[in-house]
Amino acid sequence: MMKANVKECPGADRIEGYGMNLLDPTAQFPDGKHFDIIWMSQFLDCFSPEQIESILTRAAQIMDGDSRLCIMETFWDRQRFETSAMCLTLTSVYFTAIANGDSKMYHSSDMDEIVRRSGLEVEVIHDGIGYGHSIMVCRKNR
């Protein structure tokens, strides 16, 4: 689906996908070349902090000094309106209690801590993407 969606976009020849079981801690990201961007959009919130750390640690292993890892999520503390934050925290209760027991909408400082434990650091956070998303841009620790 990703390939079909970007087929006509400028730079489509530079966009690659790689299928893998991210929850398998032995599954390695593709190695042996430079990656400008590793894009993780709205799925890390489906996992526990330990699972996220495993995913990000393995991603960090293939990054170089010029690579960036972008995490797009709806961090409840970075919402423009208090009602938006409340809706996200209530959604978090649903996911944690009913859906799978791991999912939750993270506070950005909690994700920042997981990022740091993974060998990365947050370079910048872009807020106000769409209706309430933020993009956390990460790089390898110096």
Regions found by a protein language model. Name each.
Residues 1-142:
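Alpha-helical subdomain
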